[in-house]
Amino acid sequence: MTTKQWQFWIDRGGTFTDIVALDPLGNLHMHKLLSENPEQYPDAAIAGIRFFLNTPEPKPIPVEQIQSVKMGTTVATNALLERKGQAVAFVTNQGFKDALEIGYQNRPDIFALEIATPKPLYQTSIEISGRLDGSGQEIEALELNAIHEQLLALKQQGYQAIAIVLLHAYLNPSHEQSVAQLAKQIGFAQISTSSHTSALVKYIARGRTTVVDAYLSPILRNYVQQVAAALPNVDLQFMQSHGGLTSAEVFQGKDAILSGPAGGIVGAVKTAEHAGFKHIIGFDMGGTSTDVSHYAGQYERSFETEVAGVQMRVPMLGIHTVAAGGGSIVKTHHGELQVGPESAGANPGPASYRRGGPLTVTDCNVLLGRLQPKFFPHVFGVNANQPLDLEGVKTQFKRLANTLNLAPEVIAEGALKIAVENMANAVQKISTQRGYDLKDYTLVSFGGAGGQHACAVAVKLGIHQILLHPYSGVLSAYGMGLAQKSIIETQSYAVKLSALATLAKQVQLQTEQACSKLTDQDEVVAEVTTTLYLQYQGSDTILELCLTQPLNDPQTPESLTKSLTESFHQQHRQQFGFVQPNVEIMINSISVEASSASHAVHNTPIQTKQKGLSTDTVPMFANGQWQQAKVYQREELSPQQSLVGPALILEP
């Protein structure tokens, strides 16, 4: 693959920003920076691009050398976690202004004596006239003059963002559109409507999703504009939570929550399929957390997810996150050793980074010899020119050892076991607890800390194969380059599966809308996928099945319904252990995804056919004792070569 310009694929994570660059000759290059390093640069992504183009500040970036930039970012996620979004006003029907705060009355901790109710993301709410019935028909008209005055009062109070959520708007968006038009005339900077944000049944989930969109979109837009200003006239794309790219101009807050991790799943799936593995567990261990995912032939997506204590109803890749990463803080609590959930982040980072940070999982690996300072570049400290601080780590572990009356190495190894247990439990939640047998799966390990813990996690889970791609340390960024642009259109339905054929026109309209939005981004539609979300009547458990035959085919109805019924029962039995053959199967919703052409995985050439030899020997603490571990360079290992441990395999 060759191009006359550079392409940049970037994953801006909580601790590190990874950049994969495709140069004009078709060669790939990798670079990793701290996401926050204010002494060195204002923005890590732009700093990485400057690094490859050899353009230091304050020179303008030579954008004529750039073909495209594809990014995943945690900006929206961090704003949600830290509750630093835009002040939002919530607009709804009369009698419903407290509905989102009341919610479903769920208690996250049912035995808690002191119940802490989550605070809503919006700061104020107003009720307006107008009403639709359950079929979307108007039963009370909007009083536009009165609504105009109410919105004007909000604007005068300083609100710039509003979330408009009206009853049954997913069936008829006209009322929300009229209110949004008034808000636009008044001058609100951010106007989110539920009929556009999440046109699905369930008022509470739809409303909360719309509020999240209004809360995060201004923050996200500021960051996008900041990047775009540094890269004028460059094709700038961002990864969405459902695993597809979109143009920067239409990137919304609701689609940005899993922007970074989604690139990792795409990268894991594409590289695993290229290597011949069809059933995988994605294991993405970064500095702050670990994301695990399940893949058995198709991307798993959830349309109702809770993120940072907020319920959202938009398509997201099925990712389970656990607060265990390289930066997870190791500490004691009432005499017990704990790992996480707090993280040292990028600043100050682990103790070994020489920025005054606490002991972390990374420091455990440094102390035990699994991370050797001499094999790392001198990029640490305030001036980014020092090696990892082994002596500082030893000093802090000695203090902890005095507290627990244990050897420092025993404490460090114990902390790693706790972290591995937490990560293995996360994998079990998305696999064995859903009826999948992991013995035939491959653990695809990636992320900056994945390679250090993949073997221990695989042993814990009974997985016999691990795939460590040569780009595993930057696989989320690499996944941005392999991803397709895609648009998903979802519509709620409450009909029996046996009546599927009657929805042909509605599904065709969804297809046309998805394809139109994709072509509006100057892309050619290469693939259209239709997915059904089914449930037993009276159940709230939804399973997804792909539609493999067109609905407008005269032969479709009977054969397709029979096939879908059998597949639904099979999947339900696998996951829950029983079926209900006499209960009607209902269509909850249907989604249509229009995608552009996929991108091929780059072949990584084998450097040698000779068996790689050990280049060094280093002390490593494993299984309760210090041992001598051989050191190998990954690029010098030959196919099918076996190694006897303990050993370190280095990937530059």
Per-region residue spans from a language model:
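N-terminal glycine/serine-rich phosphate-binding loop of ATP-dependent small-molecule kinases
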Residues: M1-A87, D133, E140-A163, P173-T197, ...
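Short glycine-rich, Thr/Ser-proximal phosphate-binding strand/loop in the N-terminal lobe
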Residues: I10-R12, F16-Y41, F111, T117-S135, ...
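Glycine-rich phosphate-binding loop of actin/hexokinase-like ATP-binding domains
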Residues: L22, H31-P38, A89-G95, L113-P118, ...
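Gly-rich Lys/Arg/Thr-decorated short loops/hinges at beta-loop-alpha junctions or inter-strand turns
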Residues: P24-M30, N106-D109, K119-E138, Y159, ...
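Active-site phosphate-binding/coordination module
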Residues: A87-Q137, S194-S198, G479
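C-terminal, non-catalytic interaction/recognition modules in large multi-subunit enzymes and RNPs
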Residues: N145-Q157, G264, F277, G287, ...
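Terminal amphipathic helices with adjacent charged low-complexity linkers/tails
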Residues: V165-T210, A214, F375-H378, L547-Q549, ...
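Extended, charge-rich low-complexity interaction segments
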Residues: L216-V234, Y493-L509
